[in-house]
Amino acid sequence: MKKCPSELNFEAFFHGERGEDDADAAADQKPGGGPHPPPFAMFSAADLSSFGFADSVTSTITGVIPNHIWPQSQSLNARHPAVYTIESQSSICAAASPTSATTLNMKESQTLGGTSGSDSDSESLLDIEGGPCEQSTNPLDVKRMRRMVSNRESARRSRKRKQAHLADLETQVDQLRGENASLFKQLTDANQQFTTAVTDNRILKSDVEALRVKVKMAEDMVARGALSCGLGHLGGLSPALNPRQGACRVPDVLTGLDYAGDDPFTGLSPPEQVQMPGGGEVGDAWGWDNHSNGAMSK
């Protein structure tokens, strides 16, 4: 554990006093050696009053410091009261003022637990923490107090920066959450639209297949109608190719012949005009004479 300069000075002073006591004891044992004059004879009452320390401080010092810390406090006070007061003032100032120590602890707890402070608080804290030590002329104590105040001010500024950064991060988090909710809503709408589009696509595909079947059936019907129309047109141009029309006109040709079913065939009647199916007339129907003549002529 690192010791403060006042403690180091006190230890050096204490070891020096012990060395002087040993030297005095050795001188007393020597023949002709006498005791040394008291060291406080070096300082007069005016010199002691010139120091800026009150008598209450000295009385408080002797009443507060435990005996195990100052084992030879009475002898030291008797031999070097002024030097003792000067050397130990900086180290026991806090112990001499319990109110200042309590205030220091309270301020430290408030600084650690609080969120922020102000410059006026720091100045008032410095004034309160000084207590009886504010009149100290030791530069180490002054530097220590200034360093402590500077550290607390730096910590306060650091806490302010951290709080501002934290507030900024919270604002960004809120914005990102809003954007996330908006994007999630858009994604849900897009999924719904995609599902609807897929359903409509299936319906349209089924409609297209049904229309294709209907178109194919219509094409077949058109092909059949064209074939029947072509056959009908051909039948109107050449009636001889129409079997129905020929079958209907055969009895008309036979009715022009005078033929009895039971009578023997006697030949054809005199030449008559025979109506042909085409509307023409055939004159001079040939008989046996013509037949025989034709055969003979052949």
From Swiss-Prot:
Gene3D superfamilies: 1.20.5.170. Residues 109-119 have a biased composition (Low complexity). Residues 169-183 are annotated as: Leucine-zipper. Residues 13-39, 104-138, 268-298 are annotated as: Disordered. SUPFAM superfamilies: Leucine zipper domain. Residues 143-162 are annotated as: Basic motif. Transcriptional activator that possesses broad binding specificity for DNA promoter elements with the core sequence 5'-ACGT-3'. May be involved in the regulation of genes expressed during seed development. Binds to the DNA specific sequence 5'-TGAGTCA-3' found in seed storage protein gene promoters. Heterodimer with RISBZ1/BZIP58. This is bZIP transcription factor RISBZ3. It comes from Oryza sativa subsp. japonica (Rice). The lineage of its organism: Eukaryota, Viridiplantae, Streptophyta, Embryophyta, Tracheophyta.
